[in-house]
Structure formats: structure tokens, C-alpha cells
């Protein structure tokens, strides 16, 4: 028994030594998804996840370095070793779990459609949906929720909906609205926001916080939400950090700090600063 305990203790020390001996952990982020992560006018990263990641790193025995990467290639670049963890508003989904391991979730935000004020799609408000449905969790969508989705599809039939490619939002349209709407794909949310404002999109679908950030900018003053807020299903189980499957030490270290920051209210305060509300997990 003593030998077993000694072996376990030695392995624990080896694990900590491996983490501590790493000079830095490289964090991959998009830098184009405000208020989650974004490059400001000075070319500096800012946003809820930048504050979150920096605070997390201050609690770890390592130095952290941020690396920006276009969204389409963000998981392939992780697997190729460009960085060690993704902190980039990435929802935890079963499809992504086939390639990477996720930390525990640290933030969560619903998804919603947005349109131009005065368009025919404005005003698909809760009174237009069976039972006054204003939130739809796809994990347990009953008859009323399914009816709400059906009415939304009917109202948006033939419309052009713009979304960022390789996202949960594209997955939702492909699964639930295929054939009913024309899906137009973009490399970044900034790109589809510009096209919505210019009238080249009938609607966009994105995280609520991202759309609010757009609405509060000069370019988004004529934008309004429409339809219910979606969560669950293809939208995943909150936002987490993604690591290579073999990097169990990094995963363990981040999970420990994520739990600490949740328990002491740090993550909640960060989300209130950037989203105006608590979306911590």
C-alpha cells in the first residue's frame, strides 16, 4: 500500500512539475468576436474572454501568450500545435468533442436572430408564438417550442440569413431551416453585420451578446432582435476552452482555475463588465 501511495504521489509531483516547467501556455483566440474577444483600434486584444484568460493565467504557475487565428482554422491550428488552448467563445458541442477535449464551461449565452427595423421580419415577438414562447431550449423542446420554431420558419421562408461559417449558428440553420432560407456564410461576425446594415441580408443569427454589441455601435442603430432566444441542441452546453486530447495536465490546470473563478465571483464580474449581465457558469 505504501508503495502504491508513493507511486501516486510521485506521479502527482511529475504532473505538477510538467506544468510548472512549461515556460508559457499559448492561448488561441479569434480576436474578431466582440464582446467575447476583439482587436481594438490600437491592435490590442480586449473582451470578456481576454480578461477571463488573463485572470486565469495569473492564478497558474505559467506565463500566457495570446495568438490570434481566423475562426475557420481555429481547431486545426490547435491540433497542429500553434497554441495550447482555445479561448474564443467556442461552444461545447458533441461534434467538436470528437476532435478536442473541453474544459468545464465558464460562460453561456443564447443565440437569436436580428433584422433591420422596419423590415417584414421585425416584430416576430413572443405574442406571435404559441404559448408566448420567448426561449427555446433544444434539449427539451416540447410541443409549444416546436410550434414556435415552425412559425419562425414559416415567417422567414425565402429570406437570406447571414451567419459566420463553421459555427453553431450555421449548424442550426442547416439542421432546422434547410430549404426554407438561403444561408449566406461569412468569415467573421463583423462582415455579416455590415451586410445586414447595408440590406444585403434579411437577418443574421449570432450570440445575443455579440448582437447587442453591434446594436450599440453606430452601424447597428437600425438593428432589432426578432424571434425567441435559442439554447441547447446544436448550440451546445455553454462556452469552454478546447485543448488537444493528450494535454490532460493543461485541461486539469484550467478546470481548477475555472472552478475557483466561478466560486469567488470573478467570472460573473467580468461578464457583467462586458455583457451588462451575468452570463457566467
Kindly give the residue locations of the regions a language model identified.
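Acidic, polar ligand-binding/catalytic clefts
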Residues: 54, 58, 63-153, 222-234
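Extended ligand-binding regions for polar small-molecule ligands
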Residues: 51-60, 117-141, 167, 236-277
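A local structural motif
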Residues: 57-68, 155-160, 175-188, 200
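A ligand-binding cleft/hinge motif common to bilobed small-molecule-binding domains
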Residues: 72-76, 89-99, 170-177, 190, ...
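Short glycine-rich His-centered loop
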Residues: 23-48
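Periplasmic-binding protein-like
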Residues: 31, 108-112, 208-255, 277-281
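Bacterial N-terminal signal peptides
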Residues: 7-15
Amino acid at each position: 500500500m505504501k508503495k502504491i501511495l508513493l507511486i501516486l504521489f510521485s506521479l502527482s509531483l511529475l504532473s505538477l512539475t510538467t506544468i510548472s516547467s512549461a515556460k508559457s501556455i499559448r492561448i488561441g483566440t479569434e480576436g474578431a468576436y466582440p464582446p467575447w474577444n476583439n482587436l481594438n483600434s490600437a491592435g490590442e486584444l480586449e473582451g470578456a474572454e481576454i480578461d477571463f484568460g488573463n485572470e486565469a493565467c495569473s492564478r497558474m504557475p505559467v506565463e500566457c501568450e495570446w495568438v490570434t487565428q481566423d475562426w475557420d482554422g481555429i481547431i486545426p491550428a490547435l491540433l497542429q500545435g500553434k497554441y495550447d488552448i482555445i479561448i474564443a467563445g467556442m461552444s461545447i458541442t458533441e461534434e467538436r468533442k470528437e476532435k478536442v477535449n473541453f474544459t468545464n464551461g465558464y460562460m453561456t449565452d443564447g443565440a437569436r436572430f436580428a433584422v433591420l427595423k422596419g423590415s417584414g421580419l421585425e416584430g416576430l415577438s413572443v405574442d406571435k408564438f404559441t404559448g408566448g414562447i420567448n426561449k427555446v431550449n433544444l434539449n427539451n423542446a416540447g410541443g409549444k417550442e416546436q410550434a414556435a420554431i415552425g412559425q419562425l420558419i414559416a415567417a422567414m421562408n425565402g429570406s437570406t440569413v447571414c451567419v459566420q461559417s463553421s459555427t453553431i449558428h450555421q449548424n442550426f440553420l442547416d439542421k432546422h431551416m434547410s430549404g426554407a432560407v438561403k444561408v449566406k456564410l461569412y468569415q467573421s461576425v463583423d462582415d455579416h453585420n455590415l451586410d445586414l446594415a447595408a440590406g444585403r441580408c434579411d437577418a443574421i443569427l449570432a450570440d445575443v451578446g455579440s448582437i447587442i454589441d453591434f446594436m450599440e455601435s453606430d452601424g447597428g442603430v437600425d438593428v432589432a432582435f426578432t424571434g425567441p432566444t435559442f439554447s441547447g441542441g446544436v448550440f451546445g452546453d455553454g462556452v469552454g476552452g478546447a485543448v488537444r486530447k493528450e494535454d490532460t495536465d493543461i485541461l486539469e490546470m484550467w478546470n481548477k482555475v475555472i472552478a475557483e473563478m466561478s466560486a469567488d465571483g470573478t467570472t460573473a464580474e467580468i461578464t457583467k463588465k462586458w455583457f451588462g449581465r451575468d452570463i457566467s457558469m
